[in-house]
Amino acid sequence: MLVLGYPTMAEAADAGPALLAAAPGRLVACEGMDSRIVDLVRAKGSPVPDLPRGQGWLFAEVAGKDTPDAVRRLVAAASALDTRLVDDRREAAALWRIREDGAGLAGRSLPTPAYGGWEDAAVPPEHLGAWLRDFEELLRAHGLQGVPYGHFGDGCVHCRIDFPFRPGDPASAAVFREFMTACATRLRDYRGTRPPPGTSQ
């Protein structure tokens, strides 16, 4: 398992296409997340193995022969702040648990309930970094919170969002409608969205 550290999650996403090109057909996983998920896992009291420097990370796994050579090519192409090769299976499993546990915690940690509705938004990987920057800006512009993460090698992002739904108040759905419309309009510029075949949360 190769862990790559970047200043931000969007910059981690920017590196995805270079990794895919450096090891074509060899990456069996290329997952992205940032320090918000790591902080949630730590706050729960779960151990977090050492991560490379940065606030955004890619977790990459390579399959096939000549794995050391493929890893060297990935590191050379990554333009990362810092890298860490994890050979110990137990430690690699603990790192994957951060992604798995954090994904669940991300939807339950906000001050108000979080909902699906903008799940599995996908763009071509070469546009993912730009889309993540736009997505975070759209959240802020609509007064919403969410913790994105996802399958960066596929250009696919998950995020549960604290839409301000209020029972019996149809007007409370207005923010949801406005946000979804704004996201769909912006995402069209990036030739999204369709979840890649076989992608799951």
PLM segments and residue spans:
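Noncatalytic alpha-helical scaffold of FAD-dependent oxidoreductases
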Residues: M1-G198
